[in-house]
Amino acid sequence: MVETEEFIAEAKAEIREAIGDANAVIALSGGVDSSVAATLAYEAVGDQLTPVYVDTGLMRKGETEEIRETFSFMESLRVIEAQERFFDRLAGVTDPEEKRHVIGEGFIDEFETVANDVGADYLVQGTIYPDRIESEGNIKSHHNVGGLPDIVDFEGIVEPVRDLYKDEVREVARALGLEEVISERMPFPGPGLAVRIVGEVTPEKAAVAREATHVVEEELEEYDPWQAFAAVLGKATGVKGDNRVHGWVVAVRSVESRDGMTARAQELDWSTLQRIQSRITGENENVARVVYDVTHKPPATIEYE
């Protein structure tokens, strides 16, 4: 396990040494990884840092409002409304790796716009160790690693938590005094809901994935999963009232894990599963059926794409 106080001191020193007297921007998503990286960087270089939150339209329910409130102490925080730009970029894209790269390039473009505005030379990211392992092993790229364009107009990229596992990042978050809503938050992928949508990403699919994931997180809180969410797989036939419908198939996934490198699907009570499907199909008329994913990692990955 990580020695938090020692790590925090070393990370801040590393950030100060890397950035020097220059300015930097940081990708702030609201997840524990980027939140820890942002807090470390903010405490290290203060007003030289501009935290950038990009609302891609692929975020969790209520995420943007929560970010504004939680990080209001960072006066330099910028919230970028980029939903339309990201959906335009993703139109017609169905390959999982291409989606990740498109999103990665979109993030960098947004950051570069702010960086040019504030004269930033460095990009800070919340990349953690499992991200790098999966990218280097070609299991899947991560938007903050493999999704970077070949040419980036930053002098350098700083990744203060790059050698930590998820549970270690949480320890650091607690030591930094971050709120529980951040330190204990379930992992959320950098590309957002895009990796929970099989095939083309559209505003409709994103809305279904967002609302269904909110239901899953609420209903499974007592199970204390490492990660729990809903994914939109495709369409199938169903019945609503007396009418035959062709609606979305939503997969529910809930896993136990220490660090995300391996994971086991949780055994959930039948009544819990029925309550989840009832809420998801009842609250969204475009959902025809709900299934539960029992696959461990390996052979599956935790996310769908």
Curated annotation (Swiss-Prot):
Pathway stated in the Swiss-Prot or TrEMBL entry: Purine metabolism; GMP biosynthesis; GMP from XMP (L-Gln route): step 1/1
Keyword Nucleotide-binding: yes
EC nos: 6.3.5.2
GO CC aspect terms: cytosol
Catalytic activity reported: XMP + L-glutamine + ATP + H2O = GMP + L-glutamate + AMP + diphosphate + 2 H(+)
Keywords, ordered alphabetically: ATP-binding, GMP biosynthesis, Ligase, Nucleotide-binding, Purine biosynthesis
GMPS ATP-PPase domain: residues covered: 2-185
EC main group: ligase
HAMAP family assigned: GMP_synthase_B
Subunit structure: Heterodimer composed of a glutamine amidotransferase subunit (A) and a GMP-binding subunit (B).
Summary of the function given for this chain in its UniProt record: Catalyzes the synthesis of GMP from XMP.
Name of the protein described by the UniProt record: GMP synthase [glutamine-hydrolyzing] subunit B
Organism: Halorubrum lacusprofundi (strain ATCC 49239 / DSM 5036 / JCM 8891 / ACAM 34)
